[in-house]
Amino acid sequence: VTSIALAVTAALINQPVLAADDDSDKKKKKGLEVIEVTARKTVENLQEVPVTVTSISADDLQEAGISVITEVQQFSPNTTLQASRGTNSTLTAFIRGVGQQDPLWGYEPGVGIYIDDVYMARPQGAVLDLLDVERIEVLRGPQGTLYGKNTIGGAIKYVTKEMSGESEFNVQGTFGSYNQTDFKITGQIPLVDDKLYLGFGHAMLKRDGFGEFLKVASHLGNQDTENYNKDVTASRLTLEYRPTDDLFMRLAWDSTQDDSNSKGGYRLLPSLLTDAPVPDSVFDSYTSLPTENSVEMDGLSFTLDYTVSDALSLKYIAAKRDGYSDTNIDFDNTDLDIFDVPAIYDDTNTSHELQANYASENFKLVAGAYLYDGE
């Protein structure tokens, strides 16, 4: 699949400059926090963006104990983010009732997921663990003008931190019920003072299952019978270069490996074929397929941001993402070999985006060109 998109947005600002300055002064006097977002492909004050957007900062996420992107729905109204059937890392996303309930590979979802403005084309592997994040932006409503065909419901933007230039090292551990053990390590090292920085992050997230597979087909032999368990490893490396105050370059690599078991469904009625009763727990299931599951996601991106003048800035983003999923979906939830789908999803895509932002005293322009090629 290859697609090319061009987008231009312009706005005339007719309000008197004095009035705008006066409003700004009033806000400063009231002590309102200035929250910057990039919902319209340019840095703006959240209070002044004419888009329905929720911005959740890293401090807010940490204070609320949020570790995965599905929990962001607590902060954003009219937003549903859930792990889908089959795997723990396949995302079902709805905003204002628009989305894709069945996360079929090969179909464009109704809500776009972006990592530093790089589009994640498939729902497989889109349940992102929050590692080295600066903020999450949730844009509600159609965003097709600036984000393309896949955002009729909205868009969710995962924005990672830019490095401060100081040596930093952070270790975070979380322990919980069902033997939950989460470890995250993040840090940054200046390679050349005030110019070149290396950032890194690594996470290991493990948890026993909420339920179990009560019966597994006998011909499969010994199987791990935990259902809804978690075994995820995520890594990120970033190289940032600032040769001048006007030029910024970033090379970033990220990887996610999900070895959690396949997620078994819950029976609402007893089986007519096996007489299997309805499980006591909604997390218990039956299956005739192997319980192992593997999801691998890798991404590489390059960003160049150049401030030409006080009024004009240019940005170029090139990216390549690869995904591979080997999972098993048992639709009938019995130990019989019927309605079973051993699924393998394998995809790769590349994208190139060029953005231009111009802002004068009473005129703003956002223009861009986008090329996407996926298979």
Report residues per predicted region.
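Outer-membrane beta-barrel translocator domains and adjoining extracellular loop/strand segments
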Residues: A126, G211-S218, S262-L268, T327-D335
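Acidic, small-polar-rich N-terminal luminal/periplasmic segments of exported/outer-membrane proteins
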Residues: D25-E166
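Flexible loop and strand-edge segments within Gram-negative outer membrane beta-barrel domains
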Residues: F248, W253-M297, I329, D337-Y345, ...
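Outer-membrane beta-barrel domain signature
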Residues: R122-P123, Y147, G173-T174, D224-E226, ...
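Cleavable N-terminal targeting peptides that direct proteins into the secretory/outer-membrane pathway or into
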Residues: V1-K27
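Transmembrane beta-barrel wall of Gram-negative outer-membrane proteins
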Residues: E168-N170, F175-R207, G211-K263, D298, ...
